[in-house]
């Protein structure tokens, strides 16, 4: 039983190599999906979150089919390792996105893990009751616009200093 999702093909591989093999990869994805459905926001290495995102979106699509659909129930039973989360998928998450086609998750990069400097990310279902994630600041002093503004300010201050200096010397009579 496989959940088919298109992925970028890279020299014959259609998915990332995670874990110890294909079975380990599936177990890892199932555990991540279960955690996401339970908590509606999880933190994990960026590659795992990016790989899991498509499966999380597809799981909501199956949830929207309803709990009377046999295929949807089989998919929910396979991907959710904790069976008490199956009603949450069909009764809480699927109705939340009934008018939305795709884009159920939000993924944000967070600072790297301190031990091994692994690139980390947070994935969450949109519309959850958790406090919103802070947006990253994009107005760094290194952006092109801020560099240009800084140069303009320096030019203006230099021209003002030059004009002040010339007017000051013109006003004071020579002794």
From Swiss-Prot:
Cellular compartment(s): Mitochondrion
GO terms under cellular component: mitochondrial large ribosomal subunit
Keywords: Mitochondrion, Ribonucleoprotein, Ribosomal protein, Transit peptide
InterPro entries documented for this protein: Ribosomal_bL17 (IPR000456), Ribosomal_bL17_sf (IPR036373)
Ranges of Polar residues composition bias in the record: 157-175
Pfam families in UniProt: Ribosomal_L17
Transit peptide, UniProt annotation: 1-8
Record bears the keyword Mitochondrion: yes
Predominant subcellular localization, coarse grouping: mitochondrion
Region ranges (Disordered): 155-175
GO biological process, one term: translation
Coiled coil segments of this chain: none
Superkingdom, taxonomy of origin: Eukaryota
Gene Ontology MF terms: protein domain specific binding; structural constituent of ribosome
Family statement: Belongs to the bacterial ribosomal protein bL17 family.
Subunit structure: Component of the mitochondrial ribosome large subunit (39S) which comprises a 16S rRNA and about 50 distinct proteins.
Annotated protein name in UniProt: Large ribosomal subunit protein bL17m
Organism this protein belongs to: Pongo abelii
């Amino acid at each position: 039983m496989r959940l088919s999702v298109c992925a970028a093909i890279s020299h014959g591989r259609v998915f990332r190599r995670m874990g110890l093999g294909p079975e380990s990869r599936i177990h890892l994805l199932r555990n991540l999906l279960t955690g996401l459905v339970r908590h509606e926001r999880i933190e994990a290495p960026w590659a795992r979150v990016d790989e899991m995102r498509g499966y999380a979106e597809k799981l909501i699509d199956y949830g929207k089919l309803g709990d009377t659909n046999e295929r949807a129930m089989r998919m929910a039973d396979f991907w959710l390792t904790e069976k008490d989360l199956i009603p949450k998928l069909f009764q809480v998450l699927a109705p939340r996105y009934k008018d939305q086609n795709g884009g159920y998750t939000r993924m944000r990069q967070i600072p790297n893990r301190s031990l091994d400097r692994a690139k980390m990310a947070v994935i969450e279902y949109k519309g959850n009751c958790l406090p919103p994630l802070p947006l990253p600041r994009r107005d760094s002093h290194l952006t092109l616009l801020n560099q240009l503004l800084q140069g303009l300010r320096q030019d203006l201050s230099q021209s003002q200093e030059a004009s002040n200096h010339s007017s000051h010397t013109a006003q004071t009579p020579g002794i």
